[in-house]
């Protein structure tokens, strides 16, 4: 059984991943995979360099991630181009990791932030969605990423609205409360999962 885990930016998904890992389940992290491929010499690093030129690099040759983020989130056209350029490479690499882990584990998770936006739904037996109100999401994003309200709003607006994701979720994990509430909900879901398998 493969479970897709998703949620909007600053929804608390990373905390959910830690709880799942603590329960002994393996989690493929799409963000980490992207990060690894964006290091100097990686597949995405080269694709981004070919697209945007060396203005996105730091003096040491590494990607200037804040500048890259600002560029990509600056317009819908840039986001679309980024998805086109990086999407195919990311899908290939995630599929390879998924197929490899499926040989070793009966049940595992894949943490994919843009699961619905990039049409990964058919990869999964279940989809767990971490949900948070736009107000809480905005506050957390501004605090975590040191963004202005406008920048946070642009990033949130670039993702599919929560209401459109809800019908596709097997499980919705409400994370508008505190960390203890979240742990209780996730541990309950994991217990239910263990009874299913």
Curated annotation (Swiss-Prot):
Limits of the DPCK domain: 2-197
Predominant cellular place of this UniProt entry's protein: cytoplasm
EC number: 2.7.1.24
Pathway: Cofactor biosynthesis; coenzyme A biosynthesis; CoA from (R)-pantothenate: step 5/5
InterPro entries found in the cross-reference section: Depp_CoAkinase, P-loop_NTPase
Subcellular location: Cytoplasm
GO cellular-component term (any): cytoplasm
Binding locations of ATP: 10-15
Function, in words: Catalyzes the phosphorylation of the 3'-hydroxyl group of dephosphocoenzyme A to form coenzyme A.
Name listed for the protein in its UniProt record: Dephospho-CoA kinase
Organism: Streptococcus thermophilus (strain ATCC BAA-250 / LMG 18311)
């Amino acid at each position: 059984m493969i479970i897709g885990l998703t949620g909007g930016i600053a929804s608390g998904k990373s905390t959910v991943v830690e709880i799942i890992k603590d329960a002994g389940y393996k989690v493929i992290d799409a963000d980490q995979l992207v990060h690894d491929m964006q290091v100097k010499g990686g597949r995405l690093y080269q694709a981004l360099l070919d697209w945007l030129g060396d203005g996105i690099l730091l003096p040491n040759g590494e990607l200037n991630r804040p500048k890259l983020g600002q560029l990509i989130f600056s317009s819908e056209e840039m986001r679309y181009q980024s998805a086109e350029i990086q999407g195919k490479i990311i899908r290939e690499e995630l599929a390879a990791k998924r197929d490899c882990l499926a040989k070793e584990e009966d049940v595992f998770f894949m943490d994919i932030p843009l699961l619905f936006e990039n049409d990964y739904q058919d990869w999964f037996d279940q989809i767990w969605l971490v949900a948070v109100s736009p107000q809480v999401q905005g506050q957390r994003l501004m605090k975590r990423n040191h963004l202005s309200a406008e920048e946070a709003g642009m990033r949130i607006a670039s993702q599919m609205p929560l209401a459109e994701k809800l019908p596709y979720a097997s499980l919705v994990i409400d994370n508008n409360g505190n960390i203890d509430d979240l742990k209780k909900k996730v541990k309950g879901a994991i217990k239910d999962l263990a009874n299913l398998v």
